[in-house]
Amino acid sequence: MPTGNGRRVAVVAGCRTPFCRAGSVLKHVRAMDLARHAARELLERTNLDGDEIDEVVWGQVVPSPLVPNVGREVSLLPQLPKEIPAYSLNRACASANQAVTNAHDQISIGHADVVLAGGVETLSDVPILVSRGLADILVDASKAKSLTARLGVLSRIRPRHLVPVTPAIAEPSTGMSMGQSAEKMAKENGISREAQDRWALRSHQRAAQGTSDGRLTAEIVPWFPSREGDPIVTADNGIRTDTSLEQMAKLKPVFDRRYGSVTAANSSPLTDGASAVLLMSEEKARALGYEPLAYIRAYAVAAVDPGWQLLQAPVKAVPLALQRAGIQWKELGLIEIHEAFAAQVLSNLKGFEEGLGWEIDEEIINVMGGSIAIGHPFGATGGRLVTTLANEMRRRDVQFGLISVCAQGGMASAVVLERR
């Protein structure tokens, strides 16, 4: 049976900006502007009156100190009443999934009829912190009673104080980065370099096909730049249409240079982008004349010890989501697994197959590629996965679909969608 006993929640529509490698064509665009752009286009595509929206929920992992609540900035679009409440959240790489399931909960219990959910990340513009020493000096200088005293305090600044502190993608509990954890999983689960490269190549080939035939581009909102001379961006720019196993094999490991197997080619790139998803109660969607893409049947979150296998929590979350949905693995017609690393995807699949006894059909998994090729803006990926899966379920008339996302902290999110 579906999660809870409340109202049925429909995924009405979704869209996203192009996902572009950090430091490339979207490097001058603020996260707030990307998020608002995706939301604005979703309202246009659905022709929805802004007065119908009850709440806005947005995921973001690395917010700007200048815009700490990007969700509220989305809700202040001219198309929306200023009275719509909004908030932002962070469940690492599953943030947009969490935004969608939070929206589901509010609708299910009757606190809302229509919720706009999504996520954003601009990894070209992460906050750079000053050193602790420089911060202490600046605080002392601000308390000085005279200019002479202030200059005296500032004279304590040394070159070492000017070295910035960049955000780390490492676990505070273990000190290991995502990539180091992926290396650990590859070794412990017997995932070879060749297997990782083959999965990465598969991701690029399928994403290239999905772009070529229009299935992926249909969900993309073109970005029209405000800076003179910047290009119009209409597609993801991380998809390598001409890559090969031979080219991938030339790359050296990044996280364990001597014995490692995780490379830039079989990992997801740092990415800029935003996604947006429109959710409604089934009754509201019908009343407004919408035909939903899918319905949220169930979801689950789970966690494992980060010191074990950081990105292996899907083996806990997915069975729980299927149990809550009242269905079995073999009933799934399409599956979207977030590709943080090929080593992680293959470890997850091995856990499903050997640990849970499930038969793996790769033909229904990531049928248009995944994050390795398309990109991974941390806070936005979940919205892309919901949109991609729901659209493809409609095209293929698939009854049940699954989203599986690993996340920092040894966490995972799993969502089951249904068509009828």
Regions flagged by a language model, labelled:
Residues 16-17, 27-37, 45, 158, ...:
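N-terminal extracellular/periplasmic Venus flytrap/periplasmic-binding protein-like
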Residues 1-31, 155-162, 167-168, 245-312, ...:
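Condensing-enzyme catalytic core mediating Claisen C-C bond formation in acyl metabolism
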Residues 27-115, 119-145, 220-235, 307, ...:
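Conserved beta-ketoacyl condensing-enzyme motif
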Residues 180-183, 226-227, 297, 304-373:
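Active-site pocket-lining segment
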